[in-house]
UniProtKB/Swiss-Prot annotation:
Its EC number is 3.-.-.-. SMART domains: Lactamase_B. Keywords: Hydrolase, Metal-binding, Zinc. It comes from Xylella fastidiosa (strain 9a5c). It comes from the Bacteria. The gene is blh. The lineage of its organism: Bacteria, Pseudomonadati, Pseudomonadota, Gammaproteobacteria, Lysobacterales. Pfam families: BLH_phosphatase (PF04273), Lactamase_B (PF00753). This is Beta-lactamase hydrolase-like protein. Zn(2+) binds at residues 212, 214, 286. GO terms for molecular function: hydrolase activity; metal ion binding; sulfur dioxygenase activity. Substrate binds at residue 309. Belongs to the metallo-beta-lactamase superfamily.
Amino acid sequence: MRIVDINERLAISGQPNTDEFINFARRGYRSIINLRPDGEEPNQPGNDAEQAAARRAGLAYNFVPVIGTSITEADIQAFQRAIATTEGSVLVHCKSGTRALMLYALSEVIDGRMKRDEVEALGHAHGFDLGRAVTWLERQAIQTPRVSGFFDPRTSSIQYVVTDQTTKRCAIIDPVLDFDEKSGATATTNADAILAHVEQQGLTVEWILDTHPHADHFSAAQYLKQRTGAPTAIGTHVTEVQRLWREIYNWPTLSANGSQWDHLFADGDVFNVGSIKGRVMFSPGHTLASVTYVIGDTAFVHDTIFMPDAGTARADFPGGSARALWSSIQTILSLPDETRLFTGHDYQPSGRHPRWESTVGEQKKANPHLAGVDETTFVALREARDKTLPMPKLILHALQVNVLGGRLPEPETNGRRYLKFPLNALEGAAW
């Protein structure tokens, strides 16, 4: 196995045997990064075996599985984090070393330490063909809009800043207001990270959009509106969710007319992010009010389709329907195959890094809930799976905030705010 030194901290290689890990430690490496998805080849060791071998050798270990033809910025960020969080020398491997060098080159270009026209020469200097990296950079340069994802590990949610690079105007989608259910504390860490990005990039926020009233996190829409002055929006069917939860919460004073948002989008409505046209698709199933935002060559599909290795979202919340979810997914999959899809959650199957971008074509080919599956099979699969899932731990906390557009309850006479929980209102207890 050939090891290629790229710089004083980074070396790359093809697939090593796990019995070589102890020798890597003796040679001074401190960390192994495995870029190979499990199952690429019948004889590869796999994530579990490599992790165990690294532990025995006293090496740090990171699993960042990527496919050379579908690398995303989330993959590049995970690669960068894995290197940055390790002291000392790092050995990165894939099958041949090409993906490892490709991720390094893309990282260097994105961070401004390397010019695009230097990528191929880097590959040739080390005996690799980086043509795919060049193609990736060329494709990224013409993608519209530019999408930046912000992963919240507490709720496994992804928040987005969607930017028109020409006008420097942007939309924020599904922002998270931090909440700790043990202490009852709220914070704006996630939202402030988004604001810092907006300021750093010199952007003007044109929209603050929620895809649906979330059951697993509080929306930061109101906080961001206060900070930016941008209007908030959601799908018009939010009124049905408000009426449903008004009854569950026994909340007769809740105005179930959607007035908590500045704009309600109907199916087919159009809007702009700078000079880029956006379109709203009604996508019920996960909730009664879910919408997909199609902006340029992207679609923000919230809790309908997860990453191809993670299947689809649940449909057993009050007002949910597996059959409606199937129909919504089929509408999404009718978009062009090259459409970039951005999901609302990633639960990191097999312990991999967070990912959130795929394409329509990738979903059709690789998602086990969709590839070769018909409606009847999907509904049976989805309903059976949902029966095994407990309710989200924040559903009763979050909905009373999110049906108000992200507003916290008003303070009571002692100046404190309170949440209200109905008992025995929902099925799905995990005893």
